[in-house]
């Protein structure tokens, strides 16, 4: 050892994990945090019996005993691949996610029957999901601790999950925003038109066919939110459909304008779609070229990754709104299915017994305009088939891959086994093909589009597999060639948590404030929907000259390319928030805006650092024993000295 850092590395071992963090709304908080201003230090034990816990401990637990909660110092959730029991799934969300925003009254309906709702509760102790390497480190410490039960040392875990809102005593969104101890959940959505919209044209603007998908998911653990089936399979299908349509000639001659939007923040009160409509009302630069009165039909691509069953790709059309336009969409969807005979696709209308459309961005548009025509394409009918909705387990897993999760939630242990991949690429390809051909038929307004024309609209299956590898896995993850063609990712492992909005919202935000995924989507859509500029050799270091031009691939090669594209970022944050003089202010609710009244206004607590480390400490009982021994020894020494002095004094007097 040559330095203090070397000594620290010898004494302490960092443990990798994904934290559950503190989120706040207008009425309180959810999520996890250290209970006070200090780090939590607790011995690591593998729980067997609550009566054996004599002090707050960091536990590796297999239990359903809620009485343990009062003795918990912290929770370590251990991923396992060796437990293969009968499983029913796991979803920490509600049985009707975001029911308060539904455009109908039956909010007791269970779209997500397996939902436990645990992610919407507040916990006064830290909780971490360990990575595989973190689990290995911790298991070694646990094994050593159990092997040395008679030793006077123990292994402890130190949780650094101190939230600024807990330290400052700001326990709701309004107070923490005033004290600057939190930031609003949000980010940037992306929209693009195909072909680009000529804003300076004097011609009558075309009706708009708006196709939407979501790019954000949620889970109990902040940075483990892949959302493979829900909703990223729909996002991938949308990107693949845009790619397929970009090769079709004559799109500018169609009767309707194709517009695509990818929203973020939908898992937290439909932040992206609500702000998108708000920006349309304000005619802001972020939506320049669009007019909400021209939006004729909204088609949403929801969860489509689990549509494959026994070789058949099954999808369900959930519809709402104007019957004639909706019927046209259903007819086009059916025709698209018939044009793909070799794909073995089945389309069915959702059950009439459903209370309405499932949780989706379309709810926002219906609240704004109840007469708008809308359709949501899903891989389920009356209830989610994704058994891991808004769970860290909704990932891209291999076929016949078993997963056992030791997860206690005051305290609920669930084991899960996945018998098939969460997302099937052929199902995503089928959904993308249906959407691409349906959009072409609706935009052309030709009753009998030639089969040869539809046959020319083909989805690139290799692109779908690429996107799945890039957006749903860490290997290659965002380090894949497709993503690196456009941006320089900050991390290779994708996470689809919405994050927080860091500065004043803008239609031209600083790219450092935008997450990797929306930056990639913006570049991808700009590229696929663009018209290249002639003689574009010099790049765009000095900016693009044309008003409707954008610079793509600048992060990747430092030069970039100017292209003509109507692709924009749109801020995504609560419509009840306003940024003024560097401060976020909460606006009073508008009684005419049902969704605004229901908006919880989600914020995320600030923190200085988050982490876990483990190390060895000497037991307090041993310290007390040493102290007692020292005191006893001192007393005996004193008595011995006093006795010796007395004896010596008597002896000297006799002399």
Where are these regions (language model features)?
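Secretory-pathway/membrane protein signature
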Residues: 1-655
